[in-house]
């Protein structure tokens, strides 16, 4: 699965590193089901394939959940006590019932460890339930201009009514990176969370980002890749999802979707 996702990202990279020609050029053949290379500076889609097709966003959903969490934490970085109702299947930052962290720590757990438990905890803390939190997610999506998106779960676990598109995810990533807290978090190689309870507990979460490693090989003084959202490459049921990354030189966002 890692190999296939990397191939999909490699497909987009020539446009980022070598420079796209024009939006009118015919997109090259790719095994990716959908992709978009988007420049937010002039709101231009440089090239794409099935950019508006509705697909399951999987754990890239946590871009939105983390963004809202960080926005909320900026005004009130409250204590969060992890409860049984917040437990979630799938990937986790391994919170235990009764443990306490800061609200902002949940964003770290989402972006570094892809923690479904962190996403659930944020939803309950901010809105009282995942259902109410999803309403806030959809309000934010509408504000950003995401027209082919509907969020149902804060973590991205599979639901027939939970969908987005490559273009919408590029718009979301562009918007999210305008938030300094989000941009700084996603640029880190690791984050250490100091728990409030138990006070002696500290856990380091590494950003195992294949795209970051891949892009390091292509760095040059004039075209430096400097920020990348952690790859989210699977749903609970094993589906494949959407890498999102940013190029500094041309300030372009790319999102790729690879299906089975």
Show which residues each predicted segment covers.
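Sec-dependent N-terminal signal peptides of Gram-positive bacterial secreted proteins and lipoproteins
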Residues: 2-21
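A general lysine-centric signal
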Residues: 2-3, 49, 62, 232
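Preference for bulky hydrophobic residues occupying beta-strand positions
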Residues: 15, 80, 93, 247, ...
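Residues in and immediately flanking transmembrane alpha helices
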Residues: 15-16, 75, 197
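Active-site-adjacent loops and short helices of periplasmic peptidoglycan-processing enzymes
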Residues: 19-167, 174-180
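Penicillin-recognizing serine hydrolase domain
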Residues: 28-32, 129-260
């Amino acid at each position: 699965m890692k190999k296939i996702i990397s191939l999909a990202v490699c497909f987009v990279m020539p446009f980022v590193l070598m420079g796209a020609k024009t939006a009118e050029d015919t997109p090259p053949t790719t095994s990716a089901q959908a992709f978009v290379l988007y420049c937010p500076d002039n709101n231009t889609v440089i090239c794409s394939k099935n950019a508006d097709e509705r697909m399951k966003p999987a754990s890239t959903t946590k871009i939105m959940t983390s963004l809202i969490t960080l926005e909320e934490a900026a005004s009130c970085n409250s204590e969060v006590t992890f409860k049984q109702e917040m437990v979630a299947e799938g990937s986790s930052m391994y919170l235990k019932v009764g443990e306490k962290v800061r609200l902002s720590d949940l964003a770290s757990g989402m972006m570094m460890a892809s923690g479904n438990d962190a996403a659930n905890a944020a939803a309950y803390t901010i809105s009282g339930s995942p259902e109410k939190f999803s309403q806030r997610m959809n309000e934010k999506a509408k504000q950003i201009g995401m027209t082919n998106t509907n969020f149902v779960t804060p973590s991205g676990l599979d639901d027939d009514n939970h969908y987005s598109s490559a273009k919408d995810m590029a718009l979301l990533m562009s918007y999210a990176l305008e938030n300094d807290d989000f941009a700084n978090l996603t640029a880190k190689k690791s984050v250490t969370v100091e728990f409030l309870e138990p006070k002696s507990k500290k856990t380091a979460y590494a950003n195992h980002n294949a795209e970051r490693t891949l892009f390091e090989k292509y760095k040059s003084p004039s075209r430096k890749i400097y920020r990348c959202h952690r790859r989210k490459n699977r749903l609970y049921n094993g589906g494949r999802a959407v890498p999102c990354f940013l190029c500094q030189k041309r300030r372009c966002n790319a999102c790729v979707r690879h299906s089975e």
